[in-house]
Swiss-Prot record:
Coiled coil: none annotated. This is 4-diphosphocytidyl-2-C-methyl-D-erythritol kinase. It comes from Listeria monocytogenes serovar 1/2a (strain ATCC BAA-679 / EGD-e). InterPro entries: GHMP_kinase_C_dom (IPR013750), GHMP_kinase_C_sf (IPR036554), GHMP_kinase_N_dom (IPR006204), IspE (IPR004424), Ribosomal_Su5_D2-typ_SF (IPR020568), Ribsml_uS5_D2-typ_fold_subgr (IPR014721). It catalyses: 4-CDP-2-C-methyl-D-erythritol + ATP = 4-CDP-2-C-methyl-D-erythritol 2-phosphate + ADP + H(+). GO terms for molecular function: 4-(cytidine 5'-diphospho)-2-C-methyl-D-erythritol kinase activity; ATP binding. One of its GO terms (biological process) is isopentenyl diphosphate biosynthetic process, methylerythritol 4-phosphate pathway. The gene is ispE.
Amino acid sequence: MKISITAPAKINLSLDALYKREDGYHEVEMVMTTIDLADRLYLERLDEDKIVLDVKAHFIPEDRRNLIYQAALLLKKRFDVKMGVRITIDKHIPVSAGLAGGSSDAAAALKGLNVIWELGLSIEELAEISSEIGSDIAFCVYGGTALATGRGEKISALPNIPGCWIVLAKPSISVSTPTIYKELQVDNVEHPDTQKMIESIKNGDLDGIFAATGNVLESVTLEKNPQVKRIKDRMLAFGAEAALMSGSGPTVFALIKQYSRAKRVYNGLRGFCEEVYMVRPWSEGENDTNINY
């Protein structure tokens, strides 16, 4: 059996860290949504008991360091799977960008393996299992728009956001998420209004969504990396209704109602930033998963 499955990137419409927990993680409230910048995974069931990864991108490990490999290994051990798998990853999501590319790939792998290994697990069960690998993966298992709490693994579904344009810009720097959280001072930062964001999404109010965007991690990343702030400022100067850093960065995204204005923001960033994308909110469709027996 062979299967192909889409792994969409995500952005944080709001990201709040409330306090540091005893386990070392921060208690978070994040409203996230998937976008149509996506990787594609191709899974082939093998009779031989082995996991083979083939990543069509440089600098991405194909062994136990990869979240996809960890996801496959976890399912094999948990359910005593004797079959193997070959997984080919066609990468489009930038690496180490704050867009959950690795987490989304792992989520897609879990869903694909559930099919080709005939495990019969529900989405809820897959999401629960995924939290053993990484905090963002549970959201990626569900996709769409959702509130994530706890350390990011507790997911409450929300309606999809109204149609708009999203311009992404990733500078050629890397950011350490653990370092950003370590330097975050939760008592000395402006916190986003998560409830306002949720209400705006439920009401289909784009202007309310734009106004409620916020990310406490900007207080650290923008201070340490001025080029990230310059990208955000440039987006707003070219007409973005809202601009925000995704995750711990370094990617910044602009939210825009009209195509013509989005194109102006996109063109204003090309040449200024190495990687620029113009995308839409993700809508699940019939081509998300294809199965060949």
